[in-house]
């Protein structure tokens, strides 16, 4: 009877190890946009600064609010929305969602049933804290650089061209982070990027390398989510 028990034990041991090894990946796949917000709030308590405008972030429990005075921000039109922090998808949900069958059959709401969409929507490498008004104004517009003069949000250097549906982000680290988020999402999920957009992001990636915070953020998200952004990783070694 001892031999059969050893034979049965090996598959059971193998199964146990498989489950143990698979747990982080399964946890990653189970993450949703709603769930990861809690981890992101904790993450940014050590770096309380908004994306795009660089305003200080004030914390009250789980709630976050921008400090306009810290960055000279002035609302363009929607003061109420500008008073809160929203989690910005640098690669918009429409951009990675509309390529999926679920979106084509019923839009974003229908994609809520898709594990593939939920994984992309909840990928923390693509999520950044932004002033709500700026997040709303950016919408699904493409990033660009036409040497426009920012004048819509006080001292914030973000510029939105509503007529041409394009956005000029501030020069500096933000552009590098945008580029590496796009390049990552393209490689990680097979998203198709227009040749002109890819060329722009590759240029920004070279021009604005990862700083200390971007490296730290990447490392900590890697622990939370189970994978790092290789476009950041190679610049942090």
From Swiss-Prot:
Compartments where found: Periplasm
Annotated signal peptide: 1-27
GO molecular function: endonuclease activity
Gene Ontology CC: one annotated term: periplasmic space
Keyword Hydrolase: yes
Domain of life: Bacteria
Transmembrane feature ranges: none
Major enzyme class: hydrolase
InterPro entries: Endonuclease-I, His-Me_finger_sf
Annotated keywords: Endonuclease, Hydrolase, Nuclease, Periplasm, Signal
S-S bridge residues: none
EC id: 3.1.21.-
Function: Endonuclease which is capable of degrading plasmid DNA.
Family: Belongs to the EndA/NucM nuclease family.
Designated name of the protein: Periplasmic deoxyribonuclease
Gene source species: Aeromonas hydrophila
């Amino acid at each position: 009877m001892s031999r059969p028990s050893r034979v049965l034990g090996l598959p059971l041991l193998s199964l146990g190890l498989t489950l143990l090894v698979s747990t982080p990946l399964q946890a990653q796949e189970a993450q949703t946009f709603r769930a990861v917000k809690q981890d992101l709030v904790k993450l940014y308590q050590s770096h309380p600064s908004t994306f795009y405008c660089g305003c200080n972030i004030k914390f009250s429990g789980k709630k976050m609010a921008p400090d306009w005075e810290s960055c000279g921000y002035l609302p363009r039109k929607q003061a109420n929305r500008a008073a809160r922090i929203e989690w910005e998808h640098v690669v918009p949900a429409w951009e990675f969602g509309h390529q999926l069958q679920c979106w084509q059959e019923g839009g974003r709401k229908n994609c809520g049933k898709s594990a593939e969409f939920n994984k992309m929507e909840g990928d923390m490498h693509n999520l950044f804290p932004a002033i709500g008004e700026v997040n709303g104004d950016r919408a699904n517009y493409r990033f660009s650089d036409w040497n426009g003069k920012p004048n819509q949000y006080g001292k914030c250097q973000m510029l939105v061209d509503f007529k041409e549906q394009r956005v000029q982000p501030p020069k500096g680290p933000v552009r590098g982070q945008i580029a590496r988020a796009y390049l990552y999402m393209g490689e990680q999920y097979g998203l198709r990027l227009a040749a002109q957009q890819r060329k722009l992001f590759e240029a920004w990636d070279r021009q604005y390398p990862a700083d200390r915070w971007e490296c730290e953020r990447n490392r900590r998200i890697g622990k939370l989510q189970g994978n790092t952004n290789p476009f950041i990783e190679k610049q942090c070694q």
